[in-house]
Amino acid sequence: MSKYDSKYLEDKLKKELQTEYVSVTDESDGCGGKFSAIIVTPAFNGKTLLQKHRLVNSTLAEELKEIHAFSQKSYTPEEWEKVKAQ
Amino acid sequence: MNRICQSLLRQSYQNHRGLVAGASASASTPSVLSRFFAADAATGEAVDKATLDKLVRTNKVVVFMKGNPQAPRCGFSNAVVQIMRMHGVQYDAHDVLQNESLRQGVKDYTDWPTIPQVFIDGEFVGGCDILLQMHQSGDLIEELKKVGIVSELLKAEQAKPEDEKAK
């Protein structure tokens, strides 16, 4: 359906947001309409949850027009350490 | 049949609009857990900022979703409904599938690309991911507390014996 795959989205997020860790999973069985992402970057430092998500949404504004469902978990490196520890 | 439903819903919606003007009337209907307005469609007007400014304040919590709380028509909307149910939150829900101008209107209003969208005390809080994360971190309980809603989860927590609270 959409022309995007997880690799493309990971590369773009890595480049635009200088991510320390990024993982995008295609949940659409290959049609490219549904993704979930874990995004870790210092660019999120000092931002509220809403601001983090807005940053990702604006980075992928063009792609999200075609991607039907996009779910994100966005953490600062510090938050990510805590999440991993759990 | 559909038309009959619509006209019924339209009526209830208009009643609701009256409520907003009257303000205090909502307190007299505590038996309704969540109010749902499907007939936004009936207005036919473009949904502008001034209208949304009012809509997001008709209750402490207002949700724009696909489908209605009894029958969500999207997994993300359903997740929000389930979170609200767990916390025992009474909220107003609007079905954007009934009204394309509301769907676009609310997206423009928040500059947020997806549905569902949740408002607490008139402030845009986020979509499904954010609600889920707030639910998991406990922030949702705090946010609800700020507007005078005591989460059912908090009540359950406080009712527990001390040794179980660590969980």
What are these regions (language model features)?
Chain A
Residues 25, 38-40, 73-75:
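Solvent-exposed beta-strand sheet faces enriched in polar/charged residues
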Residues 19-36:
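Short edge beta-strands and adjacent turn/loop segments
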Residues 1-4:
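N-terminal presequence-like segments and adjacent domain-start helices
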Residues 38-51:
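A short interface-forming secondary-structure element
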Residues 58-86:
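C-terminal structural segments of small proteins and small subunits
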Residues 29-31, 49, 64:
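A generic structural micro-feature
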Residues 13-22, 64-67:
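Short secondary-structure junctions
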Residues 9, 13, 49-62:
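Short, non-transmembrane amphipathic alpha-helical segments
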